[in-house]
A protein has these predicted regions:
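Amphipathic alpha-helical assembly/interaction segments
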Residues: 1-131
Length: 131
């Protein structure tokens, strides 16, 4: 169930999927951001612009939480990190749903991100059982 990176470090499938989600959130945000950066007709910025940064920050937090959970020896110590991972994936998923209502061609890529989060959750379930 482990993969190896090019520099011979063990990378678990859940770690790899978290990195994939992070990369995907950056790409989607870069694609959506120019559409949201324009001022609206009322002169105000689109409030959804902040969700693009939020999904990047949240997905960036997944890997450190995974690493910390894997480093802990006792299940009680791991629990905090496991809960954090669950919260992060839920918030990323919710922010994807919010961004799907925006006026941008980039929103077409958000279902892909949501599918990746669903795959991550399945991996997470198996991974949690193996810790």
């Amino acid at each position: 169930m482990e993969q190896y990176s090019s520099n011979n470090h063990k990378i678990s499938p859940i770690h790899r999927k978290a990195l994939d989600i992070f990369t995907l959130t950056i790409q989607i945000s870069r694609y959506i951001l120019p559409d949201l950066a324009k001022l609206q007709s009322d002169g105000f910025e689109d409030p959804n612009i902040y969700f693009t940064g939020d999904i990047i920050q949240q997905s960036n937090s997944l890997v450190p939480e995974i690493v910390e959970a894997e480093r802990k020896s006792f299940s009680e110590d791991r629990q905090e990190h496991l809960l954090s991972i669950s919260r992060l994936t839920s918030v990323i998923y919710k922010n994807c749903e919010r961004l799907e209502s925006i006026n941008s061609n980039g929103k077409d890529f958000l279902p892909i991100l949501r599918d990746e989060i669903k795959k991550f959750r399945k991996l997470q379930h198996v991974w949690m059982l193996t810790l």
